[in-house]
């Protein structure tokens, strides 16, 4: 069981098409916020990578973005990047209880979070996308259109190691 949880991503990359990556590690870690652009074109990707699994990204926005929903989220499943629906994009039953669904996905329009449900991406595997870093990667894009690309001051994560499963507590207490 890991003993240290860090809230900074190990790797943050921007791919502006064709596999040309820009390293944004330092900017994403900056506490005071050194703004950088993310997803300015429909063929751009924001890559969030870490040596350990994570289940949430926290975005501190400088300039709000305007994207045609929904954004596309992908993870590497051992052979390819596979699309998944983050928790904030899951729809909830309306209050009027008529069986219809509503919901609003996070879209870089302001500070916010996106949750990557480990239950959905259970086959998440490490891969290398740039400069030889093998990591767990989440890839975000806006293939449906962009009016204004967002600029971000920093991006933080919630590592899966930030909490224990009941099995890990059981093992820690040596009840097995």
Q: Where are the language model's segments positioned?
A:
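Conserved short "hinge" loops at termini or chain/domain junctions
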Residues: 1-8, 16, 20, 78-82, ...
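A short beta-strand element within beta-rich, extracytoplasmic domains
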Residues: 51-73
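Intrinsically disordered, low-complexity acidic/polar tracts
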Residues: 24-27
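Beta-sandwich interaction modules
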Residues: 45-49, 97-145
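Short beta-strands within extracellular/lumenal beta-sheet-rich domains
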Residues: 32-51
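Edge beta-strands of jelly-roll/beta-sandwich modules across compartments, strongly enriched
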Residues: 144-157
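Non-cytosolic beta-sandwich-type ligand-binding/adhesion modules
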Residues: 66-116
């Amino acid at each position: 069981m890991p003993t240290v949880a860090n809230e900074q991503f190990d790797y943050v990359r921007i791919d502006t098409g064709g596999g040309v990556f820009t390293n944004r590690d330092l900017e994403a870690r900056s506490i005071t916020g050194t703004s950088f652009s993310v997803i300015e074109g429909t063929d751009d990707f924001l890559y969030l990578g870490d040596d350990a699994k994570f289940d949430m990204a926290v975005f501190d926005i400088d300039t709000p973005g305007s994207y045609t929903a929904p954004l596309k989220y992908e993870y590497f499943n051992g052979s390819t990047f596979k699309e998944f629906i983050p928790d904030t994009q899951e729809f909830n039953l309306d209050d009027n209880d008529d069986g219809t669904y509503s919901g609003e996905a996070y879209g870089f329009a302001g500070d916010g979070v996106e949750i990557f449900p480990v239950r959905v991406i259970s086959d998440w595997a490490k891969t290398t996308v740039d400069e030889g870093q093998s990591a767990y990667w989440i890839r975000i894009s806006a293939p449906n259109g962009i009016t204004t690309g967002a600029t971000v001051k920093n991006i933080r994560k919630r590592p899966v190691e930030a909490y224990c499963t009941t099995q890990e507590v059981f093992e820690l207490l040596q009840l097995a």
